[in-house]
Amino acid sequence: MAAVTLPTHYRNVFAELGYAQAEIDARIENTFHTIFYGDEAHRFYHPTGPGLAYIEDTGNHDVRTEGMSYGMMLCVQTDHKAEFDALWSWVMHYMYMQDGPNAGYFAWSCQPDGTPNANGPAPDGEEYFAMALFFAAGRWGCGSGIYDYAAMARCILHSCLHKGEKPGTGRPMWDPENHLIKFITECDFTDPSYHLPHFYTLFSLWADEADRPFWAEAARASRAFLHKACHPVTGLCAEYSLYDGTPHNRSDRDQRHDLYYSDAYRTIANMALDYAWFGADPWQAENAERLQKFFCETLCGRTNGIWEIDGTSLPGEALHPVAITATNAQASLAAGGPNAEVCVRRFWNTPLRDGPRRYYDNCLYFFALLALSGRYRIWPL
């Protein structure tokens, strides 16, 4: 495997553009407080008893592995260990599956009282859980039991790769042949926004030693896949894709998923963070510039639409326009040129979202805020 060099400096794009550090720090602190401890109209972190708490998907009124793992990542990046442990404890108490073909995975959706809505996992939750746990180990050290963060991360990743090797033990979350993450374990297609090569690079250092070559190859494979999934002019990708990058629309669903829509917004932010941490793929900067040009010049700043990946506008409005603004800004970690500054300043002037759809938008908002301030960091073991 190629040697991995961890970053020693994290860009503070806000400071580069002249924002005062005290102002940046206050924005981060206020954002955390609003999401975790604001009034009922704004927060979506909910303590449920001693040492337990959940993140609510306010648009769907449930608790998802996506949101719980996002919350844990936000907590470790902002040094809030008590909240991290409360979320992780809720996950292990209510979401962890101990029996059946999905044993070792997490039920992707539960009701706020912990009742499972599903008995299957969604792989984006598992990969974020593992990464957040490794960072917790690096930042705070490990405890015992479920708070032996690094051991728990390795257990999750072992399940992700090795389930199904024995009959009746379920399916893996990564295709063992092409090294690409699946949308769900039983489907042979993917979601471009699930591809986190920067995480896999770190897994290649910290996962079970026997699996480290797989994770190194997964990082390479995901970077190559994203070239195929993103449109060569607009930089956009679909929510779901075949392994060759072709947009994919599930035949068993009424809603289209071959468009630039909710899940897809995360993809450009993920690639920008990969570029900021490792700089392994210069194409990521080129693609970020294409996407910003599409939104800033072709669309003249509009972020509330629905588009084919070639930029064709469709009827309807985006459910999560603030998420688009946030991820367009995070793309500036990779992009250069005048549109990078425009996107960051537009984001800085955008408030957190109110209303029932605030969960997804405000999670991506907080990630972008941390990334653009140099506060979304690797916490090495």
Label each region the model flagged:
Residues 61-68, 115-141:
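Aromatic-rich carbohydrate-recognition surfaces in CAZymes
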Residues 72-79, 128-139, 198-205, 269-276, ...:
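Short glycine/serine- and small hydrophobic-enriched flexible loop segments
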Residues 306-381:
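C-terminal functional modules
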Residues 82, 86-90, 94, 122-133, ...:
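Outer membrane beta-barrel
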Residues 27-70, 75-97, 102-118:
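Internal amphipathic alpha-helical repeat/solenoid segments
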Residues 71, 83-84, 146, 153, ...:
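Solenoid-repeat scaffolds in large eukaryotic assemblies
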Residues 2-30, 34-37, 42-43, 61-65, ...:
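Extended ligand-binding clefts on enzyme/binding-domain cores
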Residues 75, 88, 133, 150, ...:
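Inward-facing hydrophobic residues that define packing positions of alpha-helical scaffold repeats
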